C-alpha cells in the first residue's frame, strides 16, 4: 500500500502514449462499437467498417486491406468489438513493424551529419534539441547548427538546447545564408571532434519553391566537405495536420533524400492514425514519436505499443 505522502509513480511512456492518443482511440472505438454490436458481418457492415478506418486517417489502401482481413471467412457470422480490436491492433502492428527503426549513428562517419527538415509549427527545432539530449546522454559529442536563419526565435531556441546539452551551437544573425552556416558547422565539427552534427532548416510554407531550393543548396554545400553527407535526413511531421502530412512527405521527398520520419504532437489529436497511412504509402523509417513537451516525451517508435494505444488494446 502506498503512503499518501509519497508522490505517485511516474507514468510510463506507453501510458503517456495511450493518454495522448485517447482522442484518436475514442473516435475509432465508438465507430467499432456502433458497427459491430449485435450485427452480422455482411457487405454493409464491412463497408461501414472501411469508412470508419478511413475517417480515422488510416488511409484508403490500408482500410480496404484491413476490412478484407476482418471479413475473411466470417461472412454472416457475428464478431465482437473485442475481436475486431485485436485484429486491428495485430494488423497495424504487423505493418508498422516494417518502419520501426531506431536512429543509428554510424561511428565510421565522423561527424555523422543529420539534416532535419519540416514546415514551421511541427516542433522541428524542439525535436532537434530533444534528439541532441538523447545523443549526448548516450555519450555522443553533438554540434547544433541553427540553420533556420529566418526565425530569430529558432536560433535562440537552439542556443538554449545547446546550453542544456552542453553542445556547441553554430549560429549566425537572422537572415544569414543557411547553406554557408551548414558548411561552417560541419567544418567546425571536424575540427572539434564532434560525433554528430544536427542541422536545423527553415520551414516557410508560404515560399515553398524557395524553401526547397534552399534545402537542395544545403545538401550540395555539405557534400563539398563529405560526399556521403548528409548521412540522415529526417522530416518532422505534426500529427494534428492529419492528411496534410502525406503531401508534406511528397514535397520534401521530391527535393531531398529523406531517410526517416519523426511524428510529433500525438498527444491530444484525433488524427494519430495518419502515421499508419504514412507508413503504408511511403514505407519510410519512423525513428521517433512525440507525445508532449518534455525531452522524455520523444521516444523511439515502438510499432506494437503504438498499435495497442491507437486501438485501445491494453
Predicted regions: what is each one?
Residues 93-314:
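P-loop/Walker A NTP-binding module and the surrounding RecA-like catalytic core of P-loop NTPases
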Residues 1-102, 108-116, 133, 137, ...:
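Non-catalytic terminal/linker segments enriched in charged/polar, low-complexity residues
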